[in-house]
From Swiss-Prot:
EC number(s) on file: 6.1.1.10
Locus of motif 'HIGH' region: 14-24
Cofactor(s) needed by this chain: Zn(2+)
Record NCBIfam families: metG, PRK12267.1
Cofactor binding mode and count: Binds 1 zinc ion per subunit.
GO cellular component: cytoplasm
GO biological process, one term: methionyl-tRNA aminoacylation
Binding sites annotated in the UniProt record for ATP: 309
Catalyzed chemical reaction(s): tRNA(Met) + L-methionine + ATP = L-methionyl-tRNA(Met) + AMP + diphosphate
Protein name as annotated: Methionine--tRNA ligase
Protein family: Belongs to the class-I aminoacyl-tRNA synthetase family. MetG type 2A subfamily.
Described purpose of this protein according to its UniProt entry: Is required not only for elongation of protein synthesis but also for the initiation of all mRNA translation through initiator tRNA(fMet) aminoacylation.
Organism placement in taxonomy: Bacteria, Bacillati, Mycoplasmatota, Mycoplasmoidales, Mycoplasmoidaceae
Amino acid sequence: MLKQKKFFISTPIYYSSGNPHIGHAYTTIIADVLARYKRLFGYDVFFLTGMDEHGQKIQQKAFEENISPKALVDRNSIIFLNLWKRLNISFSKFIRTTQMDHEESVQKVFSYLYKQGKIYLGQWTGYYCVSCEENYNPAEIIKSQDNIMLCRMGHKLETKSEESYFYKMSDQAPFLKTYYQNHPNFIIPNERANEMVNNFLNNLEDLSISRTTFDWGIPIAENPKHVIYVWLDALMNYLTATGYLSNNEELFQKYWCDNETEIVHLLSKEIARFHCIYWPIFLNDLQIRFPSTILSHGWIITKEGKMSKSLGNVIDPNVLIDTYGVDALRYYLMADLSLFRDAIFSEDNLIETYNTQLANSYGNMISRTLGMLKKYRNNIVPKYVGCVLKNDEKLENLINKNIELVQENINKYSIDKALNCIQEILVEANKYIEDNKPWELAKNQQEQELDSLLVHLVKVIQVTTTLLSPILIEGSKKAVEQLNFDESFLTLASLASYDIFNYHKVNDSKPIFARIIVEKQ
């Protein structure tokens, strides 16, 4: 018996100082879609997401609201969880860094690395960004027109000097450069690896990993006036969520200790530095395998540029769900936005993509096919007898080829290209209808030809519904109900067979994706 393949995918844990926006939704939907596809492909999947709940910014925010930091992060974790529920996110675990088991494991990690000589006590002086939770040296800062020091994200910097524990990193750059070269798929896209080398590794410094100016964090057991700085705390969630250094390491052993597990960290490009440089150094010193791939996607921007609260162009995914529905949002983000570059979010494009690819193409194919089955065959799918029409074989070959291409593209994280392959099947099927003219086949009593056409169209619906099911969670369920399928019809194994529909009775058609009509101003 073949060993089941394993797939571990994580989002970054999201900082718990504010409400989720479209960027959070985008990252999490990508991870969910990849997790669902891998389950469809037969993988054992562990999908991790959660909240980063320590740090100065949270402590300040709680003070401003006159509540405790714990009350703030408790409230915000519920807000994120409610959004994930609305977006049909199928995570395996939702971790919070304020959980006791995480905090205890992080303290153990610090103590181990300190005893190994990887960590030392020193003095940190420089520029600090509260918003980014990041230190900046003079070479990295930007001066505004009025001479204010800004970080690369445009936030105001503070000048600080304090006692800090440091992680020895300055001598690890050659090791990482070699690893990048020998493992070209470690960082995707490849230009992100080049950014790491050119912008950071050539001047890699030891990393400050503790703070004394605030206390909302994990205290260091050896020196409790220090709390562990966000990145050593936050990055460890990928291990602690699986029970690393706890009383139950079963999941850690299952996923992290198996070198054949495909481990993917999905994240936005602004935090690539921490995952591509600091994280592998931590793992190397802990003698733990590296992730297979760090998948660093681009930003969602607007026509005005990057989203920011000050510009008032931050997009609330809840509003989009209320307006267009969850499937429309999930599909648009996966179909129109490539992971590997920045993409402009446009509601006009969302509507166009929805109407063209879901309402007109996929939804209309279901309506037309079920309508013909009702009209010509009393809702009964005819028996499959092979290729009868001259273009039956062409359609079958395209279906088989594109099923494989969808899998190949998903395994390369090219979700948009996979969806193009699915749409190609639907476009060809519409052409197949127009070429064969079922209304004339019925009129001329060409029963065998009409039967073949109907069977092949049901196969098109089964294949496209199966391949779209990781994205269209609600729409695929409605399609299954109308087709009177059970879950066994929506598996890769079932896609190879045409005779599973023999004399299968379908239900009447109801619109699944009604067109969005935009009133002209």
